[in-house]
Amino acid sequence: MKPSKILADLISSATGAKTHYDVWWAQMSDAKPQHVDVMNEHNDFFRASQDAHYMACFIYLAHLFDKRSDSSSLPTYLTAIRSSTDPTKFQDIEARFSALARRAAPLVTVRHKLVAHVDAGLSEKDVFGPLKITWNEIRSIIYDSAAFVEELAGAPHQGAVGIPRSGRLSEATLKLLRALK
């Protein structure tokens, strides 16, 4: 497996997770107080959009942490670069990945039980309840995962490899809603 191909896939997945989360969050939280009338006027669109962005953010984030050896994931990428990376640097990368993977595990559970393989016996509340995770923590995990991918790609600054800067898509969503008023 080529590390460059895997890294390109990781950038795509990190971009997707962050972008879809930001657009979903803007619609579900930031926009509600000021733009509820516009959102109600275009109800069908916003319901479909909210659902699509919600599901996509969990799917893209789960790509990053997929443990299958045939997937373009962080574990696969680390395996691919192990022999060509300084051992001390690799240990640091691996330790940081392990900490991030532990934090992301609840979101992979959400993806499995609510998005990809909808559990017939569990509601959204049943899935999220035992995970004891807040939306602020979810945002932090998504943003930290994207930053980790940017770092692996050698990005000199946030946004350099195409992953949007934090909040950019929320701002764009709110700008669109203001234009619809």
Task: Show which residues each predicted segment covers.
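Amphipathic alpha-helical interface segments
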Residues: M1-R103, F128-K181
